[in-house]
Structure formats: structure tokens, C-alpha cells
């Protein structure tokens, strides 16, 4: 089945281009941003605006509550269903997002890994709370150095999952190597936005300031009230810093600076991930929706 993928780093303009392509190709947009699946976290995840949603139908937004799990396998299954529905109605599926795990799972399938073990997860999370996240990361490094090199010490969710997988008898790296992601599940036109680094950083910095001015603090306040002040570990970038500012632990400028840095680092990881994907066409700005639509139609 054919589809269009609009990928690229955060703040590069994916949503605007996806909407423009949808209008020209008769398409509908399937979200592939892991942060936009959470209900109620709109400003801090830069979800499509009401105007953008009115301009083109969107799928796979607002799927789960904050703190709930959403992994690549579940995303791929939901995306498969949405894509099939769109195509069955004679429309063009346009996948938009920069979450590498989600994109890879959709295009090439998922690794068959052991299921979740709630008891082990609780024990590992308690260990991290007692000894610190770097200590748990060091434990992963002893078991699977390659996985530890890919995962940041503070990314508790991924460190715990990697150790959970390793407890099943094979390390994450062994499973990934065996899978190799060779299968192409879709005939996809892969477009990746590639703005110059200075331009991208300026866009990120401006977006983060707009988030703080436009409702991120209010969303963080509502989360803190809902969870009794202790925010869930699995939250998009920016909410922990916004909550820290509300508690008086960070002044506003420092909170903004930290979120800007975190988004820049995330953008870098997104680009590195996409560089590994085969068949990607990198698009430099200014983006020309008309020319790109013609390019897609000629495939």
C-alpha cells in the first residue's frame, strides 16, 4: 500500500507541510509523534491547531491519558488500521511525525520482545529511586553496552524496558540485530525536512518561548493538581521544567533555557535516526507543497 511520510526534526514544519500536501493530494494525516498521543497536553507538544485539523482530517492524536503507556508496537497497529481505512475511502495516507521508533515500526515492523513484567518494573523503578538513575543505567551498560550507549541515563522508561527485555534471556541489541528491520511494509514516499541547524535552533527557541507564554504552565499546573504534585515519569519534554518553575525551583528564564536545550538535543537525535533510514529524500527549505505533491504523484 502506498503512503507519504513527512518526517524531520521537531519545529521543522512537518505539520504545515503535511496539511498542504493533504489538501493537494486528497489526503488525511496520521500522527507519528509520540508526544502528541497524550490527551490534554496540547501546547507543550505543539499539536496541530484547530485550523490545521479543520484543513485536513487527523488521526491518532489524543489516544491515551498522561502517564499511560504507548509503545511502537501499539502505535504501528493503530496506524495500520488508520492507513487501511484512509486508503479504502480513496484518500491518500500521509504520516507526519519525527518519532524514529514509531516510523521504523510502521515501515519495517517491530521486534518481538518479551512482554511487560509489572513486578520487575516496580523493582527496577524502586532501585532507581533508591540508588539513582545513573546506577540503573550502569547496570544496563554491564548487560548490554550497545543499548546503554543509545539510551540516556535519565531516560528511566527506556532503561527499565531494556533491562526488562534482557531479563527474558536476550538483550535488546541481540533482538534488534536479529530483526534487522529489512522488511518494507509499505510503498512509501519518504520526505524528511532538513532546515539549516541555525534556523532550526532559532525555530525551536521561539517555539519554546511561545509554549511558555501560550499555556504550557497552565497544562503543567493541571497535571500537578491531577497527580498530587508528583508528575508521571512518561511525559513530553517541557512539563517537568514547567512544573519545577511553578514550585519555585527554577526561575522562568532557566526553565525556558532548559526546555530549549532539551528540544535541540531531541532534534539532533531525530536527524541521526532518520539518516539511518533508507530511501529518504531530504528537503531543504523553503518547502514547495505543489512541487512535492507532483513528485509524490509521479512515483
Swiss-Prot record:
The keyword tRNA processing applies. Its cofactor is Mg(2+). This is tRNA dimethylallyltransferase. ATP binds at residues 8-15. The keyword Electron transport does not apply. Belongs to the IPP transferase family. Keywords: ATP-binding, Magnesium, Nucleotide-binding, Transferase, tRNA processing. PANTHER family: TRNA DIMETHYLALLYLTRANSFERASE (PTHR11088:SF60). GO terms for biological process: tRNA modification. Catalyzes the transfer of a dimethylallyl group onto the adenine at position 37 in tRNAs that read codons beginning with uridine, leading to the formation of N6-(dimethylallyl)adenosine (i(6)A). Substrate binds at residues 10-15. One of its GO terms (molecular function) is tRNA dimethylallyltransferase activity. It comes from Anaeromyxobacter dehalogenans (strain 2CP-C). Its EC number is 2.5.1.75.
